[in-house]
């Protein structure tokens, strides 16, 4: 307490004393110029007084004020010497200026030692803070003094900025929260014409707790200078396919990578383009101009990444003109830091009048960043061994920040979220990321304590404000050797990458879209197309067939591989049904089906069992009813041949019947007439959920109730294909009536043709008997068997149940493929069915026929009335 009281008493005295000394000094300079001998004496006296003030245990704010006054004393001397250099007495002023800079540098170096010693003896935390703050300010002054010496005293020599850069970097290390050292480094970067390095340090001087006041203007000046400079590598006709980011249209130019590191053509062309592309997020510009700049940037980036590992590492050096001892892949790390600041700056922009513009800029930034980082991941995969890739530190930093970025974007309103281009870019990045993650070994999904050690890249970006939540979890105090080189801690870096990726997979925020998934059992990463799953392909990361593609139609996944079960997506995805799994044979793609598009409307109810004949008939009748097709022809079971045209897949369960036809019977379109028929194929999987699906996209219809008829009437299959399900329209269904599908594209029905609502099969039979006497049909027998249990599945196709009066059915004239047009569209369904016998000829020229339904009733009536020999268990196609 007594020491503090003494310091408080001495403080006013020292301040008054130094104030008086400075008054005498400026009076002497103005009267006798700065070259007078008394000037140096008064300067030394003022310096010693300031030393005493720093030892008086001032408050932090007071130390800032005193330190500023001390630097102002030196800066006034520097300003006077610069004025003298313009006079006739140039040589004397130059000599005196050089002497003053040397004395001033020596003064600050001694002051650092004295301040550290004084505050170290205090043994207080506040004393340590004051010491670090003052030393950081003194290092900045030392850097400025050295910079002036190189700038003014070595005008005819090649300046060496390494000493000044070393002081600035030491200042940043002493007090990371200050933006002043980085602003000074940005100034040095402009001296060596390194625009990317200047951009990086301008960003660092802004994205800290204590931003440098003039850094914002310096950043804008840097962008304006870049805009005004012509760039030879900027192509006015360059284009980029945002919906296919992995596409590389331009060929890599031949580059002489044997040149000096600082003269690499790829680097000279690339880095100014990065600055030009970044400027669009800070200066008002045309989006068309951005497209050309970005396309040119990606072209040069591809060219740079085409270099081998040695030349790539040399290309990524950043401080070769400022500090030759500072080595590492700084360029790519600086680009990632700039990307992070872009999102940080956009998030802080407020104002409803610019919301739309900010949304566009955000999506544009997402597109740019994820495409560039996708290229980074691609290049990492080409490095052997993988842990030696110089791009991995930048990838780790980006993965650490990625959960915060995705959460920040998804916090916006619905219209502010990802657009088509940004979704494509994000999917591209994660698709490449999965490849590199699955090459690494996941030792422990819970990040061990040793992996929380700060690595080289963490020390480099320490105090970058957007990364503060991440740095708070890292240990910067131990294992300081890790900060020396990016080559150290390779194993820790790989484990950190895996840990960051797992953190991305565990994002549980409500409404957030998941881009990456992790299988805990197999320690395997996989990705899915998320909200776009109904328009394309899914990648599965676990199971026997991981990383294989499967076709997705609506909420059900159909995997065209035998005995392979799919992995349902995580709970975040909206899955109506678990995937149905093939148990016997893979789907067959006949030449007949491949010749024409396959409609997505080929659907059957999940609550019924259908015969393969019905499945094939239903499939063939709906060919061409919707727009999407299997464009690859479905020639084999290779999943790579399954391609769906984008944006046309209905969000409905597919027709499984179309996939289960027998291989041997599906060689041709007219295989229904061949012996032994098409046997049923067992399907396993939950099917009860099909009941909840709606019949029409715009109108909900209740499920058709069905009661078994009396024994005297024939039993009807639940999927009777002779009625149209739309009870509101009451239109007759003709397999070749294309207008129905053209008017209602994309409508999916759980029953292809459910029974007419409101009338039972018994009532139909009664009405039919009253209107027409049924004569017994000609007898027939199933070939080779007396058991009709599986007649429809395995019975004779020569004597079809659909053939009129039991006559053999010619394969070329199968009634399934030549349906009747029963009546006009304006008639109601009841009128059509009641007057069916009045039909004479249809527009297709076919003869009068009571139709497949009435023939079916006649034949089944005959079966019920004739002997017990033919009676057996219900046929397989009846769902009894």
UniProtKB/Swiss-Prot annotation:
Keywords: Repeat, TPR repeat. PANTHER family: SMG-7 SUPPRESSOR WITH MORPHOLOGICAL EFFECT ON GENITALIA PROTEIN 7, TELOMERASE-BINDING PROTEIN EST1A. SUPFAM superfamilies: TPR-like (SSF48452). The gene is SMG7L. Residues 691-701 have a biased composition (Polar residues). InterPro entries: DNA/RNA-bd_Est1-type (IPR018834), Est1-like_N (IPR019458), Est1/Ebs1-like (IPR045153), TPR-like_helical_dom_sf (IPR011990). May play a role in growth and development. TPR repeats lie at residues 149-183, 184-217. It comes from the Eukaryota. Residues 669-711 are annotated as: Disordered. The keyword Repeat applies. Disruption phenotype: No visible phenotype under normal growth conditions. This is Nonsense-mediated mRNA decay factor SMG7-like.
């Amino acid at each position: 307490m007594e020491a503090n009281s003494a310091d408080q008493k001495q403080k006013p005295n020292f301040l008054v004393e130094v104030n008086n000394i400075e008054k005498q000094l400026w009076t002497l300079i103005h009267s006798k110029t700065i070259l007078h001998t008394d000037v140096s004496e008064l300067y030394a006296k003022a310096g010693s007084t300031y030393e005493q003030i720093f030892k008086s245990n001032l408050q932090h704010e007071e130390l800032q004020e005193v330190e500023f006054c001390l630097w102002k004393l030196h800066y006034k001397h520097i300003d006077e010497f610069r004025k003298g250099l313009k006079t006739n007495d140039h040589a004397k002023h130059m000599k005196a200026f050089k002497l003053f800079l040397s004395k001033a540098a020596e003064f600050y170096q001694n002051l650092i030692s004295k301040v550290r010693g004084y505050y170290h003896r205090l043994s207080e935390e506040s004393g340590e803070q004051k010491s670090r703050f003052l030393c950081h300010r003194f290092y900045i002054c030392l850097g400025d003094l050295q910079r002036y010496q190189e700038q003014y005293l070595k005008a005819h020599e090649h300046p060496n900025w390494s000493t000044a850069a070393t002081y600035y970097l030491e200042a940043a290390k002493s007090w990371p929260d200050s933006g002043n050292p980085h602003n000074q480094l940005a100034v040095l970067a402009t001296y060596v014409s390194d625009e990317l390095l200047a951009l990086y340090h301008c960003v660092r001087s802004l994205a800290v707790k204590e931003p440098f006041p003039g850094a914002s203007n310096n950043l804008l000046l840097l962008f304006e200078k870049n805009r005004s400079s012509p760039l030879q590598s900027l192509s006015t006709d360059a284009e980029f396919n945002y919906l296919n980011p992995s596409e590389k249209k331009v060929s890599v130019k031949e580059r002489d990578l044997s040149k000096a590191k600082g003269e690499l053509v790829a680097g000279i062309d690339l880095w100014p383009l990065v600055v030009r592309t970044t400027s669009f997020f800070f200066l008002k510009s045309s989006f068309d101009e951005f497209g050309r700049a970005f396309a040119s940037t990606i072209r040069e980036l591809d060219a740079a990444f085409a270099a081998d590992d040695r030349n790539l590492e040399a290309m990524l050096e950043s401080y070769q003109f400022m500090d030759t001892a500072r080595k590492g892949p700084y360029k790519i790390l600086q680009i990632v830091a700039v990307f992070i600041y872009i999102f940080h700056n956009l998030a802080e922009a407020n104002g409803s009048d610019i919301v739309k513009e900010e949304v566009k800029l955000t999506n544009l930034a997402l597109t740019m960043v994820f495409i560039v980082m996708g290229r980074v991941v691609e290049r990492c995969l080409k490095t052997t061994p993988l842990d030696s890739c110089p791009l991995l530190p930048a990838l780790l930093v980006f993965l650490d920040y990625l959960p915060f970025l995705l959460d920040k974007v998804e916090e916006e309103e619905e219209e502010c979220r990802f657009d088509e281009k940004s979704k494509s870019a994000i999917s591209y990045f994660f698709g490449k990321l999965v490849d590199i993650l699955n090459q690494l070994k996941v030792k422990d999904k819970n990040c061990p304590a040793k992996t929380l050690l700060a690595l080289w890249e963490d020390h480099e970006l320490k105090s970058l404000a957007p990364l503060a939540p991440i740095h708070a979890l890292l240990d910067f105090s131990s294992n300081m050797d890790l900060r020396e080189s990016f080559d150290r801690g390779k194993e820790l870096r790989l484990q950190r990458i895996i840990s960051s990726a797992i953190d991305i997979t565990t994002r549980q925020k409500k409404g957030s879209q998941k881009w990456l998934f992790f299988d805990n059992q197999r320690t395997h990463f996989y990705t899915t197309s998320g909200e776009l799953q109904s328009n394309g392909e899914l990648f599965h990361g676990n199971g026997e067939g991981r990383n294989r593609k499967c076709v997705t139609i609506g909420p059900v996944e159909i995997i065209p591989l035998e005995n392979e079960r799919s992995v349902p997506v995580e709970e975040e995805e909206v899955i109506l049904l678990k995937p149905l799994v093939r148990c016997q044979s893979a789907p067959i793609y006949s030449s007949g089906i491949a010749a024409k598009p396959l409609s997505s409307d080929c659907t059957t109810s999940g609550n019924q069992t259908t015969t393969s004949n019905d499945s094939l008939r239903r499939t063939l009748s709906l060919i061409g009813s919707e727009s999407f097709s299997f464009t690859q022809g479905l020639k084999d079971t290779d999943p790579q041949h399954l391609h769906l045209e984008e944006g046309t897949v209905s969000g409905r369960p597919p027709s499984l019947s179309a996939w289960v036809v027998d291989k041997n019977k599906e060689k041709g379109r007219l295989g229904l007439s061949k012996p032994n028929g098409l046997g049923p194929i067992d399907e396993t999987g939950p099917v009860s959920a099909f009941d909840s699906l709606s019949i029409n996209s715009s109108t909900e219809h209740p499920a058709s109730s069905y009661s078994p008829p009396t024994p005297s009437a024939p039993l009807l299959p639940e999927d009777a294909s002779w009625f149209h399900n739309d009870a509101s329209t009451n239109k007759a269904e003709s397999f070749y009536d294309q207008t129905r599908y053209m008017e209602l594209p994309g409508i999916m029905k759980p029953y292809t043709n459910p029974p007419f609502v409101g009338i039972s099969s018994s009532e139909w039979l009664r009405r039919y008997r009253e209107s027409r006497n049924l004569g017994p049909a000609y007898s027939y027998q199933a070939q080779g068997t007396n058991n009709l249990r599986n007649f429809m599945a395995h019975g004779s196709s020569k004597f079809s149940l659909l053939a009129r009066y039991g006559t053999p059915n010619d394969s070329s004239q199968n009634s399934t493929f030549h349906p009747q047009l029963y009546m006009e569209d304006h008639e109601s369904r009841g009128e059509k069915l009641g007057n069916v016998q009045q039909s004479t000829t249809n527009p297709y020229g076919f003869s009068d026929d009571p139709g497949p339904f009435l023939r079916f009733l006649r034949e089944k009536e005959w079966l019920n009335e004739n002997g017990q020999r033919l009676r057996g268990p219900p046929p397989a196609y009846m769902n009894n």
